[in-house]
A protein has these predicted regions:
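Selected transmembrane alpha-helices and immediately adjacent juxtamembrane segments
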Residues: 1-39, 123-172
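Structural signature of hydrophobic alpha-helical transmembrane segments
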Residues: 6-7, 12, 36-54, 97-107, ...
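Hydrophobic residues within alpha-helical transmembrane segments
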Residues: 12, 16, 51-58, 74, ...
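Membrane-interface helix caps of multi-pass small-molecule transporters
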Residues: 19, 23, 35, 39, ...
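Juxtamembrane helix-boundary/capping and inter-helix hinge elements in multi-pass membrane proteins
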Residues: 38-42, 62-68, 159-167, 191-194
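Hydrophobic alpha-helical transmembrane segments in multi-pass integral membrane proteins
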Residues: 45, 86-91, 141-149, 183-184, ...
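Selective hydrophobic functional segments
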Residues: 47-96, 181-224
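Transmembrane helix exit motif
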Residues: 58-65, 102-128, 216-217, 221, ...
Length: 245
């Protein structure tokens, strides 16, 4: 596969996944991970997606700041930060092969949870105990520190504490901006953002911009449930393929 084809395929993945996050406020990194890490490698792919997700989330925060629920953001941030530091340590000190296997299991779990909520709506409506919610936030922080994709676990909590669509999207995007700023800072301090990472990130920017434009247009026009069922079905398959490959 030529480099041009690889970049085009990665760009198409970035467009689709970041359009979905522009609609919902969540999902771009975890959806893009199996494909982009397959094309660029685990660590390089994670770094590129972290930067792109930061840009997208910052755009939504700036344009939708009035929708942020600050007390919920603060609560979520405290528990997630505790796990984030552990995840960042693991990312820098664990080999890529074990990381990829952990990532595969995580993707399968996250996709399965989301699909179960669509098949059995009452599961998503059940109120979880506060302690369980806080544990999910902590675990989500660990996953986010490793792969910048702790969203699925954090969303399980936030979907109950932030039931309004606009509040949900804006508050979570502020969380992603905060967490990814810390992670990107660690990349800079460890000199892991190399020239290839910078170049590929720049190439992905037009695809990101197109995803934002389409996602904002679709936010008011397309049922997000239709998008998410198809996307998480694909994600589940991708996680299985990554596990057995």
């Amino acid at each position: 596969m030529t480099q041009a084809v690889t970049l085009l395929l990665a760009g198409l993945v970035v467009f689709v996944t970041h359009a979905l996050e522009a609609i919902t406020g969540f999902g771009c990194t975890v959806l893009a991970l199996p494909f982009v890490t397959g094309l660029f490698g685990v660590k390089q792919g994670v770094e590129i997606l972290t930067i792109l997700a930061w840009i997208l989330s910052l755009y939504i925060v700036i344009t939708k700041v009035k929708d942020i629920v600050w007390h919920e953001f603060t609560k979520i941030l405290i528990f997630v930060l505790a796990g984030l530091l552990i995840g960042m340590y693991l990312f820098h000190h664990v080999d890529s092969a074990p990381l990829k296997r952990i990532l595969s299991y995580f993707i399968i779990l996250a996709a399965s949870v989301q699909l179960i909520q669509f098949v059995f709506p009452k599961v998503g409506q059940m109120r979880m105990p506060k302690a369980v919610g806080y544990i999910l936030l902590f675990l989500g922080g660990i996953i986010h520190g490793m792969f910048s994709s702790g969203g699925p676990l954090i969303v399980l909590y936030a979907s109950q504490s932030l039931p309004e669509k606009g509040n949900f999207r804006a508050t979570l995007c502020l969380l992603w901006v905060t967490l990814n700023s810390i992670i990107i800072g660690s990349y800079v301090l460890s000199s892991s953002i190399t020239r290839p990472v910078t170049t590929k990130t720049l190439v992905m920017l037009p695809f990101l911009a197109a995803g934002i434009v389409f996602g904002e247009w679709a936010h008011q026009r397309v049922k997000k449930e239709t998008f998410k069922v198809l996307i998480f079905s694909t994600l589940l398959l991708a996680g299985i393929v990554m596990l057995v490959a």
